[in-house]
C-alpha cells in the first residue's frame, strides 16, 4: 500500500511538471514570436520619401493651394487662381500661366519632415486607395490630395472632403493630412 501511494505521488508530480513545462514552452514561443513581429515592423523602417505634394482645392473659391515638400526641408507653396473651367494636372506639375499663380518658399524643421515621414509610414500611406472622397453630401467642401514619392514608388490619395469619413482608411488619410497641415501652420 505504501508503495502504491509513492507511485501515485510520483505520477502526480510528473504530471504537474509536464504541465508546467508545456505552459512555459508556450509562453516562450509567444514571447519570441511577438519579438519577431516587432523586429519585422521596426526593420521595415520609415519610407524613403523623396517628395510630398499636398494639394487643396479650396471649396467655394476659385483657388488652389499646392505645397511641395522635399527632404532638404524646403517647401514651395503655389497659390493658384485658375481661369474659368480650365483644368490642370497640378500633381503632374502642370500649371497655368505665370500671372495666375504666386509662389512662396519657406523651410520646415528636420523634426517636422521626419514627423511627416513617420506618420506616412505608420498609416501605411502607400497602400491607401486613390479615391478617398467622402460618402456624405457636403456643399462647398474642399478637396484634399496627397502625393508621396519614394525612391521606388508613387502614391496619390485624396478626393472631395477626403479624410472626414469615419472608416479606417479615412482616419489614416486624415492623420497624414493633419501632420502635413501642422508643418504648414507651424512656420
Question: Which role fits each region the language model picked out?
Answer:
Residues 26-61, 126-187:
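Short, well-ordered, aromatic-rich surface patches in folded extracellular/luminal domains
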Residues 104, 108-141:
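Short, internal acidic amphipathic alpha-helical interface segments
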Amino acid at each position: 500500500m505504501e508503495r502504491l501511494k509513492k507511485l501515485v505521488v510520483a505520477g502526480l508530480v510528473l504530471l504537474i511538471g509536464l504541465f508546467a513545462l508545456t505552459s512555459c514552452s508556450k509562453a516562450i514561443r509567444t514571447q519570441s514570436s511577438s519579438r519577431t513581429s516587432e523586429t519585422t515592423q521596426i526593420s521595415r523602417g520609415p519610407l524613403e520619401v523623396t517628395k510630398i505634394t499636398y494639394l487643396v482645392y479650396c471649396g467655394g473659391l476659385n483657388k488652389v493651394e499646392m505645397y511641395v515638400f522635399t527632404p532638404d526641408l524646403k517647401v514651395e507653396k503655389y497659390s493658384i487662381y485658375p481661369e474659368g473651367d480650365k483644368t490642370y494636372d497640378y500633381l503632374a506639375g502642370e500649371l497655368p500661366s505665370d500671372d495666375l499663380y504666386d509662389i512662396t518658399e519657406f523651410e520646415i524643421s528636420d523634426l517636422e519632415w521626419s514627423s511627416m515621414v513617420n506618420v506616412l509610414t505608420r498609416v501605411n500611406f502607400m497602400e491607401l486607395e486613390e479615391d478617398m472622397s467622402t460618402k456624405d453630401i457636403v456643399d462647398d467642401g474642399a478637396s484634399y490630395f496627397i502625393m508621396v514619392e519614394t525612391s521606388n514608388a508613387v502614391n496619390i490619395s485624396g478626393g472631395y472632403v477626403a479624410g472626414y469619413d469615419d472608416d479606417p482608411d479615412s482616419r489614416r488619410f486624415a492623420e497624414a493630412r493633419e501632420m502635413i497641415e501642422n508643418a504648414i501652420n507651424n512656420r
